[in-house]
């Protein structure tokens, strides 16, 4: 826990034991930055600052959506900023603020072990660095809060900028026909869309929170102006994310259309191949029918000739005068009859 006294000349580090005296003195802005809430930090929030138990509970536990609680002497705000993790996962980095008349308490929400401990401290450290360098001289806790929240929105904007490069890369793959691994492409597509939706949600909810804060009766016109500026920053991030989501949606539609066209062409080629095979099979069947028909036509004469050609001693028909011409007549008639039948059935 860092206890700081921000004055017109800079910033001074103080001890926790000095907090009650600092809050009573009326000199400068008392800034307490709590990287993670432990028993001592919870005691400070409850006993020294005497914050509402519900606000303390929200500061100790993880908030999945931004929150705003307005009290008579302070405002509690919970916000999120994105951090890209493994395999496209987006971590929600939480920052809670108690903004009073003479103090600002910043509490960094429960941190996922997969996130480096320095990541949640970026915005508060950036503001502290600016104060130490003389580039920032906040006169009120709201002005200090404005600087910290502005750093958050810049981080969100940088997050969108990085995802924009991914969107352009996906678009180049699709339009260039360079999708060599569809599974990897779809994974990258989902991760990019997920990241844009996550940061868009954070910015939209942040805009709603700060827009509501502008209507609070307990803040001055200057404070209202700074709050409205933070709302405008969140709204700008949301609009940028919306634009990239629309662009990515166009890439998805183009890719889907490409897949449909390719699938249609493949199906058409398969149908053409099947048709060619069917035509070849039909032609072969016609040939088989013609061959079978002629074989049947010649089978009858062959059968009769074979019988008459048998070289047996006792064959009465060989001694019959009309046997030979009758055999020839039967051969001719049977052949003609078979020819007519096959012709009528279009086998010939």
Identify the role of each PLM range.
Residues 34, 149, 156, 237, ...:
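Alpha-helical transmembrane segments
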Residues 72-187, 204, 211:
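Extended alpha-helical interaction modules
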Residues 1-4, 10, 20, 24, ...:
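Cytosol-facing regions at membranes
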Residues 6, 25, 70, 99-100:
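Generic beta-strand structural signal
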Residues 102, 152, 173-175, 180-308:
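Membrane-associated alpha-helical segments
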Residues 289, 294-348:
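Alpha-helical transmembrane anchor segments
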Residues 1-60, 110, 119-127:
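N-terminal pre-transmembrane cytosolic regions of membrane proteins
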Residues 60-77:
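Short, structured protein-protein interaction patches enriched in aromatics and acidic/basic residues
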């Amino acid at each position: 826990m860092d206890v700081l006294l921000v004055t017109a000349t800079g910033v001074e580090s103080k001890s926790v034991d000095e907090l009650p005296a600092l809050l009573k003195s009326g000199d400068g802005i008392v800034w307490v930055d709590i990287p993670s809430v432990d028993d001592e930090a919870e005691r400070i929030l409850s006993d020294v600052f005497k914050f509402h138990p519900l606000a303390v509970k929200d500061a100790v536990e993880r908030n999945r959506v931004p929150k705003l609680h307005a009290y008579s002497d302070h405002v509690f705000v919970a916000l999120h900023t994105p951090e890209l993790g493994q395999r496209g996962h987006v971590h929600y980095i939480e920052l809670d603020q108690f903004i009073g008349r003479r103090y600002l308490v910043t509490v960094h929400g429960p941190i996922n072990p997969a996130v480096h401990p320095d990541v949640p401290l970026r915005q508060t450290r950036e503001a502290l660095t600016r104060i130490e360098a003389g580039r920032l001289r906040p006169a009120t806790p709201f002005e200090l809060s404005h600087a910290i929240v502005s750093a958050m929105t810049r981080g969100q904007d940088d997050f969108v900028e990085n995802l924009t490069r991914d969107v352009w890369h996906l678009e180049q793959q699709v339009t260039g026909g360079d999708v060599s691994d569809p599974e990897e492409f779809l994974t990258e597509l989902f991760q990019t869309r997920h990241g844009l939706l996550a940061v868009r949600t954070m910015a939209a909810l942040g805009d709603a929170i700060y827009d509501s804060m502008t209507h609070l009766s307990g803040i001055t016109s200057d404070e209202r102006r700074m709050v409205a500026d933070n709302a405008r920053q969140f709204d700008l991030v949301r609009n940028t994310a919306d634009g990239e989501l629309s662009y990515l949606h166009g890439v998805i539609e183009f890719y889907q259309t490409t897949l449909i066209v390719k699938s249609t062409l493949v199906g058409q080629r398969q149908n053409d191949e099947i048709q060619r095979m069917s035509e070849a099979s039909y032609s072969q069947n016609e040939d088989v029918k013609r061959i079978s028909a002629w074989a049947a036509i010649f089978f009858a004469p062959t059968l009769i000739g074979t019988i008459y050609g048998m070289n047996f001693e006792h064959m009465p028909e060989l001694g019959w005068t009309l046997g030979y011409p009758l055999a020839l007549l039967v051969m001719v008639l049977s052949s003609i009859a078979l020819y007519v039948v096959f012709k009528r059935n279009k086998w010939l």
